[in-house]
């Protein structure tokens, strides 16, 4: 049956003949594998053998090998229903092929085309047991029950005689008995003649059966091939003969055991050694039984395999060794066996170990790293151990050659990394190993800066105890106290101040720690600094005090604390803005109220003559504007800046309709003129704010908007609107014309 020139091919033979087309044509191997498992052809654990491969064609090739080893029935189910569902076009191509090479169908139970036609007609798959193949008959016998019973009885006696011939090693008798018999006949328990010959270790009979076309991949009821039987019994010569003839060393039974598994667990080391030797000859970059042992954490099997010549660093299709699989699955026992046997430890394996973050597994590598890894790889492992705060691993790596002061591509040393992450246990080990504590990052961050930033008081205390200056300067001249203030760490600040940190150091931008705590809204840090008598009047490069920053951020509690500590509520910065200007501009109503309660001047002017009300009006901050107006009892409602603009000009120009209404209700002059003799109505028309224009021209509670007022270029509000080019300007023009009775 091994010939490729026949007219009635079996499913196995179709796979063999069309192997290359199937390997390249199966596009969804994972889907097909799911179907094969669902239909009982393959066991779920077979998925590991296929899924470990990354190349689709390699997956397909291995899947076909496994199918062939499962026998004819498995190959039939592969075609129908599995291939038909997963790859319908490829199935149709195969069906057309087997139909074309068959001119006549004589036995639909055995020929693939008959099987496919039958199943296509039925539309479903029926589970069937492997059929018993009877001795060939030369005469046409009538199909009647009594005669069938006679045949079965005769057949039973015949089979008993065959088994006796095999068990006794009587080759001559076997030749006589099998003249009219298919050598692949299924006997009891799905056993073939080859199964029995292999189990009894009859080498000569095995060779005879192989010459007669005995199939190597047929399985018994336990899913075992003839090679399984030979290996289980320790028949080394027979096992080697079968392996050399092409038997799959990696075929698995129903318990996922290969022949090597069975030989090893039964103590047949000679057989193990021979099969390992055959495996090494036939495999290149494929999964070995040692890989399987690593995945299963079968340390005993791994020991036997290695003792009998298995290559400890053999790579599979993904270029992974058995050690890599053992580590990836967290299988410490097998990993220990592999390491003891000299398995190479590379960076990928160390990465896999760190992914599990299991200290006991990582410790297995430590005595091997110096021999197996480069200095760069050992140093990289040290950084990983520091990152995970594995103190014992850090110590062991340093003892085995890792450079405690190594620097990675980002400029970190292990000390700097531990400080930044706040990993105190790893840091203590590094200090005990005499690591340098005064190294800096490229941006000038010191280990103390990083410890403060991470909030690790433990690390900060160690550094200060070791003599690191608490006033050490970092990026932009920031001290550790600046960072602790920025990150709201009052306990850290207390530690730094206790050991002599300066209370009011300034950065390149002129910021003190109090500035940074105030602008970040850190109430606790501000309280800590004020308790230490920090300078509330200190100004940064913009001339701002801490109160300016608290006001701009709307931090009411900090504003109140600063005022209580003596901060000047009317302090002016470089542009003459007071904290009240900044709070009003941002619309922080409660902050405005707090500052006013602290005697802030509502009419204070900046360098452009703008009051806090100007800022509120420009930015549309209605509530803040209302608070300011109420505080001054509207006395400052018409204050003008250097361009003689009132708050109403700014509110109108920016289209803040509601605020325009508030200002008008507080007696703002509706026709006030700026330096260009523009009224608020001119400003609203120029910027195209229709709602604001409506609010102004419809105001009737007091002085009304002068529609005829002209500015210094002799244009009234209508003419200003007509100069605009937007739809809003057109609508304003129409509105004004109607208001002026120029149109109906």
From Swiss-Prot:
Composition bias type Polar residues, residue spans: 137-146
Superkingdom, natural source: Eukaryota
Induction pattern: Up-regulated in response to bacterial infection with S.typhimurium. Highly expressed in macrophages when infected with S.typhimurium.
Chain intervals for the UniProt region annotation (Disordered): 127-146
CDD domains, per database record: CARD
Keywords in alphabetical order: ANK repeat, Cytoplasm, Immunity, Inflammatory response, Innate immunity, Repeat
GO cellular component: cytoplasm
Any GO BP annotation: regulation of apoptotic process
Protein name: CARD- and ANK-domain containing inflammasome adapter protein
Segments forming a coiled coil: none
Record's subunit section: Self-associates. Interacts with caspa.
Principal location class: cytoplasm
Function according to Swiss-Prot or TrEMBL: Probable inflammasome component which mediates inflammasome-dependent resistance to bacterial infection by S.typhimurium through association with activated caspa.
Tissue expression from the record: Expressed in kidney, heart and skin. Not expressed in muscle, ovary, gills, eyes or brain.
Residue ranges annotated for the CARD domain, each copy included: 7-79
Location(s), subcellular: Cytoplasm
Disulfide bonds: none
One family name in Pfam for this protein: Ank_4
Gene name of the record: caiap
Consequence of gene loss (knockout): Morpholino knockdown results in reduced caspa activity and impairs caspa activity in response to bacterial infection with S.typhimurium. In addition, larvae have increased susceptibility to the bacterium S.typhimurium.
ANK repeats: 157-185, 189-218, 222-251, 255-285, 287-314, 318-347, 377-406, 410-439, 443-472, 476-505, 509-538, 542-571, 575-604, 608-637, 643-672, 676-705
């Amino acid at each position: 049956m091994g010939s490729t020139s026949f007219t009635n091919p079996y499913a196995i033979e179709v796979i063999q003949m069309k192997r290359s087309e199937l390997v390249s044509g199966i596009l969804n191997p994972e889907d097909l594998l799911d179907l094969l498992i669902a239909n009982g052809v393959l066991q779920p654990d077979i998925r590991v053998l296929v899924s470990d491969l990354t190349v689709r064609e390699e997956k397909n090739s291995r899947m076909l090998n496994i199918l062939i080893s499962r026998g004819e029935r498995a190959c039939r189910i592969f075609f129908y229903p599995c291939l038909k569902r997963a790859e319908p076009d490829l199935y149709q191509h195969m069906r057309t092929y087997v139909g074309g090479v068959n001119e006549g169908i004589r036995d639909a139970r055995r020929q693939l085309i008959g099987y496919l036609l039958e199943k296509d007609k039925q539309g479903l798959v029926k589970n069937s047991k492997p059929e018993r193949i009877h001795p060939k008959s030369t005469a046409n016998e009538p199909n009647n029950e009594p005669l069938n019973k006679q045949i079965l009885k005769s057949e039973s006696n015949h089979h008993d005689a065959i088994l006796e011939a095999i068990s006794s090693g009587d080759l001559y008798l076997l030749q006589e008995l099998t003249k009219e018999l298919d050598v692949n006949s299924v006997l009891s328990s799905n056993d073939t003649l080859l199964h029995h010959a292999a189990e009894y270790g009859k080498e000569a009979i095995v060779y005879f059966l192989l010459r007669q076309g005995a199939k190597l991949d047929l399985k018994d009821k336990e899913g075992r091939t003839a090679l399984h039987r030979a290996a289980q019994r320790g028949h080394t010569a027979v096992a080697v003969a079968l392996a050399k003839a092409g038997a799959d060393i990696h075929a698995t039974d129903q318990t996922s055991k290969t022949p090597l598994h069975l030989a090893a667990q039964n103590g047949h080391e000679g057989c193990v050694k021979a099969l390992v030797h055959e495996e090494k000859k036939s495999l290149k970059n494929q999964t070995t039984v040692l890989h399987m042992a690593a995945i299963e954490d079968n340390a005993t099997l791994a020991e036997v395999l290695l003792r009998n010549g298995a290559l400890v660093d053999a790579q599979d299709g993904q270029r992974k060794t058995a050690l890599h699989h053992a580590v990836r699955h967290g299988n410490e026992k097998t990993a220990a066996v592999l390491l003891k046997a000299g398995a190479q430890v590379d960076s990928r394996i160390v990465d896999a170990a760190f992914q599990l973050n299991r200290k006991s597994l990582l410790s297995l590598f430590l005595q091997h790293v110096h021999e197996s890894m480069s200095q760069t790889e050992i140093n990289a492992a040290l950084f990983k151990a520091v990152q995970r705060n594995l103190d014992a691993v850090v110590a062991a790596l340093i003892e085995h050659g890792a450079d405690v002061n190594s620097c990675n591509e980002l400029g970190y040393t292990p000390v700097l990394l531990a400080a930044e992450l706040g990993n105190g246990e790893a840091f203590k080990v590094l200090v005990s190993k005499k690591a340098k504590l005064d190294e800096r990052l490229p941006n000038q961050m010191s280990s103390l800066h990083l410890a403060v930033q991470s909030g690790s008081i433990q690390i900060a205390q160690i550094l200060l105890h070791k003599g690191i200056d608490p006033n050490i300067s970092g990026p932009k001249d920031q001290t550790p106290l600046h960072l602790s203030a920025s990150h709201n760490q009052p306990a850290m600040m207390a530690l730094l101040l206790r050991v002599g940190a300066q209370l009011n150091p300034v950065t390149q931008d002129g910021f003190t720690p109090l500035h940074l705590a105030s602008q970040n809204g850190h109430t606790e840090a501000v309280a800590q600094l004020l308790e230490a008598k920090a300078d509330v009047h200190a100004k940064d490069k913009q001339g701002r005090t801490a109160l300016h920053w608290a006001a701009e951020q709307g931090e009411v509690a900090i504003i109140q604390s600063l005022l209580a500590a003596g901060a000047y509520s009317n302090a002016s910065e470089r542009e003459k803005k007071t904290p009240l200007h900044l709070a009003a501009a941002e619309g922080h109503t409660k902050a405005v109220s707090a500052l006013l309660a602290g005697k802030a001047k509502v009419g204070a002017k900046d360098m452009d003559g703008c009051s806090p009300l100007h800022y509120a009006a420009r930015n549309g901050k209605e509530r803040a504007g209302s608070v300011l107006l109420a505080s001054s009892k509207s006395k400052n409602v018409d204050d003008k800046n250097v361009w003689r603009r009132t708050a109403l000009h700014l509110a109108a120009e920016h289209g803040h309709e509601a605020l325009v209404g508030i200002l008008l209700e507080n007696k703002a002059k509706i026709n006030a003129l700026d330096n260009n003799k523009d009224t608020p109505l001119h400003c609203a028309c120029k910027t195209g704010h229709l709602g604001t224009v409506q609010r102004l021209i419809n105001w009737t509670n007091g002085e009304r908007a002068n529609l005829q007022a002209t500015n210094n270029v002799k244009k009234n509000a209508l003419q200003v609107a007509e100069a605009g080019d937007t739809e809003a300007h057109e609508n304003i023009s129409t509105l004004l014309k109607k208001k002026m009775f120029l149109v109906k």
